[in-house]
């Protein structure tokens, strides 16, 4: 369906607003993926707080202009599905990585995080970022471990001191 100028401007404005609030973006090629599978992907994306949209490449170039995702411009070739993660930087990458594992025709092209282009081969860097809760849990575990280790060393020193006396 052909879009008129107002329709194109509305799409650019809407998606640019999403891009401004996003932490990361992932670009993929969904040629050959069935509509049912794409519907599942979109549903999973909504649940994960990921905004997904298929947009014309010329409009995408305008959308990412002046954003940290400008580095993705060269990947806008062929059918392009773009996903913006607003809540967690790795959400879209994790979603696309899992979907690509089950759907051979789905191809992740690249991702962008904090203005840095991440090639498809290195998408794991973004997909494996811990969520806020996971990061806090790891930090607390490390702090607990350090405190417990200090206690053990103190008790061992006391034991050694008593044995020496």
UniProtKB/Swiss-Prot annotation:
Annotated GO MF terms: large ribosomal subunit rRNA binding; structural constituent of ribosome
Superkingdom, taxonomy of origin: Bacteria
Keyword Ion transport attached: no
GO CC entries: cytosolic large ribosomal subunit
InterPro entries: Ribosomal_uL10 (IPR001790), Ribosomal_uL10-like_sf (IPR043141), Ribosomal_uL10_bac (IPR022973), Ribosomal_uL10_bac_type (IPR047865), Ribosomal_uL10_CS_bac (IPR002363)
Key words of the record: Ribonucleoprotein, Ribosomal protein, RNA-binding, rRNA-binding
SUPFAM superfamilies (UniProt xref): Ribosomal protein L10-like
One BP term from GO: translation
Family the entry assigns: Belongs to the universal ribosomal protein uL10 family.
Function: Forms part of the ribosomal stalk, playing a central role in the interaction of the ribosome with GTP-bound translation factors.
Record note on quaternary structure: Part of the ribosomal stalk of the 50S ribosomal subunit. The N-terminus interacts with L11 and the large rRNA to form the base of the stalk. The C-terminus forms an elongated spine to which L12 dimers bind in a sequential fashion forming a multimeric L10(L12)X complex.
Protein name stated in the entry: Large ribosomal subunit protein uL10
Organism: Yersinia pestis
């Amino acid at each position: 369906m052909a879009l008129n100028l107002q329709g194109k401007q509305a799409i650019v404005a809407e998606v640019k607003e999403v891009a401004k609030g996003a932490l990361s973006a992932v670009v993929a090629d969904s040629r050959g993926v069935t509509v049912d599978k794409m519907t599942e992907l979109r549903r999973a994306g909504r649940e994960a707080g990921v905004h997904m949209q298929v947009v014309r490449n010329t409009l995408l170039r305008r959308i990412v202009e002046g954003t940290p995702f400008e580095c993705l411009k060269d990947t806008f070739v062929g059918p392009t599905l773009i996903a913006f993660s607003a809540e967690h930087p790795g959400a879209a990458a994790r979603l696309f990585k899992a979907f690509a594992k089950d759907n051979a025709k789905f191809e992740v092209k690249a991702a962008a995080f904090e203005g840095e282009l991440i090639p498809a081969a290195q998408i794991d860097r973004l997909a494996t970022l811990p969520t806020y809760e996971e990061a806090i849990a790891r930090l607390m575990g490390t702090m607990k471990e350090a405190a417990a280790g200090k206690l053990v060393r103190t008790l061992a020193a006391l034991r050694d001191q008593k044995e020496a006396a």
